[in-house]
Amino acid sequence: MIVTALDPTHPLAAGLTHASRLVRSYQGERQEVTPVWFMRQAGRSLPEYRDLRVGTRMLDVCLDPAMASEITLQPVRRHGVDAGIFFSDIVVPLKLAGVEVEIQPGKGPVFERAVRTSADVDRLSAVDPAALAADTFAAVQEAVRLTTAELNETPLIGFAGAPFTLAAYLVEGGPSKDHLRARTLMHAAPGAWARLMDWTADLSGAFLRAQVLAGASAAQLFDSWAGSLSLRDYAEHAAPASARAFSHVRDLTYTVPSADPDGEAVVRAVPIVHFGVGTGELLPAMHEAGADAIGVDHRTLLDEASRRLGHIVPLQGNADPAMLAAPWEVLSGHALDVLDRGRAAPAHVFNLGHGVPPETDPAVLTRVVELVHGWRA
C-alpha cells in the first residue's frame, strides 16, 4: 500500500492531537485517565443546540460550515469530553452525490426513489464517487477546518455511515424495523447488491477521507443496521464493503518524533473505529474489516466483547443510554461497571452503547465525564 502523509498543518502531523488520550487509546495504549465522548453528544439534549436549530432543516445545517462547526463544538465546551464528533448525517454524502433525500422530523431520512432493482442500482452508480467534483465536500471540509481551529489539542472524529446501513436506507426508501427488502435484494440479486455495496463503500470512504484530510484525527464508521444480519451474511455481503470504505483512509499517515533525541521517528496511520448496533456476534468480522478499535453497543458486556476479540483490540463503549435517566447511584454504578469491564481490553474509550437520548439532562452527561476522568484502573 502506498502511504500518503498528512499535511504538516494537520492536527496529528503538527503535534496537537497525536498524543491525546483518545488517539493513543484507539491505537492500543491504555491511558491513566480513560477518555470519554458520547455518540450524538452534539444534538437535541443541549439547549444551545435547540436554540440554534430553530427554523432550520437538518441537511441545510449539516452543509452550513459555521453552524455544523458550532454544533460540533457545543458539547466539547459544555462537558469537557475528550473529542468532538463531527456534526453531520450519514445521508449527507448521498445528498452531495445527487440522491434526492430529505430528513423528516420524527421519521428520519426519506428517499424520493428507492433502489429495488438492478436497473435502479445502475442508475444510482452512474454517478461515480471517484469522479465527483473536487469541491463536492467543500462545505464539509470547511466545517472541519473551522472546528479543529477551535479544538486545538482536542481531537475531532470524522464519521460516515457504513456501506450496509446506507444501502439498507436506499433499498428501503427510509427507516425500517427489519430491513427485509435490503436482505431480500442481497440474496435475490447478488450482483446488483455487490454493485450497490461497492458504490456506497466508495461514497462513505470519500466522505471519511475528506474529513480526515481537512483535520479529523480519527475516523469512525457507524453501522446502525448491521445487527439485522447473520454472521454469515455480514461476512459475505457487508464486511468487504466496510473494508473497502476503510481503504479510502487507511493510507493516511503522520510522523511522531521520538522522545529520545537519538531515536527514530515513528510513522502512524490515522486510527479507524468500527461501530455497529446489535453486532455482538459480528465483532471479530468487524475488526477483520480493518478497524483499529471496535465500538460495542450496550447489549454486549465489554469483557465479553474483549474475549471475543482475543483481548487484543481497543474497545469503545458501552453504557446503556437508558441509564442516563436513572438515579445517580444507579447510573454511576453502571458507569463504573463499564469502566471495570473495559479493563479486559488493551485500551478503552468510554462512550454509550448508542446515541444520547434527546431528553437527557446535560448536567448528567457532564457528571458522567467527571466520574470517568476521576476513575483509575
From Swiss-Prot:
Keyword terms: Cytoplasm, Decarboxylase, Lyase, Porphyrin biosynthesis
Chain residues that bind substrate: R40, Q41, A42, G43, R44, D89, Y169, S224, H354
Subcellular location(s) of the protein: Cytoplasm
Catalytic activity: uroporphyrinogen III + 4 H(+) = coproporphyrinogen III + 4 CO2
A Pfam family annotated for this UniProt entry: URO-D
GO molecular function: uroporphyrinogen decarboxylase activity
GO cellular component, one term: cytosol
Broadest EC class assigned to this enzyme: lyase
Enzyme Commission number: 4.1.1.37
Main localization, broad class: cytoplasm
Involved pathway(s): Porphyrin-containing compound metabolism; protoporphyrin-IX biosynthesis; coproporphyrinogen-III from 5-aminolevulinate: step 4/4
Gene3D superfamilies noted in UniProt: 3.20.20.210
GO terms (BP aspect): protoporphyrinogen IX biosynthetic process
Site for Transition state stabilizer, residues: D89
Protein's UniProt keywords contain Membrane: no
Annotated family: Belongs to the uroporphyrinogen decarboxylase family.
Quaternary data: Homodimer.
Function noted in UniProt: Catalyzes the decarboxylation of four acetate groups of uroporphyrinogen-III to yield coproporphyrinogen-III.
PANTHER family the record matches: METHYLTETRAHYDROFOLATE:HOMOCYSTEINE METHYLTRANSFERASE RELATED, UROPORPHYRINOGEN DECARBOXYLASE
Protein name listed in UniProt: Uroporphyrinogen decarboxylase
Taxonomic source organism: Leifsonia xyli subsp. xyli (strain CTCB07)
